Structure formats: C-alpha cells, structure tokens
Amino acid sequence: LLDGLEVALVDDVLRKRFGLEREVEGLVVVGVADNSRFADTFPLGAVLLEINGVSPESVDHARALLESRTTSRVYILNQGRVRYFAIRP
C-alpha cells in the first residue's frame, strides 16, 4: 500500500492480535520494513481509519484513494488515539 508497509482489513483475528475494540474498522498495519519512510508514522498495529474522507474497504480501495491525490489526508488509530497525517505516497 505504502512503501514498506503491509496492511490487512481488520477482522476478529487481527482485533485479538492487536487488542482492537470490536467497533474498529479499517486497515491494520501488520508489517513494517525497517527502512520504510513510513515506519514512524504507521507503526505495527496502527489502523488506517480514513483516507481522504473515506473509510477504506480493502487494500485496493485504499490504494485507489491514495492515488487519487498528490497529498492524502489519513486518519489512524494508534495506542487508543486518533491522529491525522498528510502524506505523499
């Protein structure tokens, strides 16, 4: 999805693995390459809740949302806090 990140749609297995509440929906970061420029912004277990005002329904959907703009607004949930980032893929 983004350079060095592996994400997956949140499901019950990933909720349990990362301690996510039942109502959390989106894409969870399940892998981060050490050399990824996004490693600090999107740590393991962070959930991409919204991209450009839309909740991603799949990895392909998220990719299309990111590619639709040169700079994208991304809201993530990490350690119980929602944070906002403007990123360039």
Predicted regions span which residues?
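C-terminal recognition in membrane/secretory proteostasis and scaffolding
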Residues: 1-89
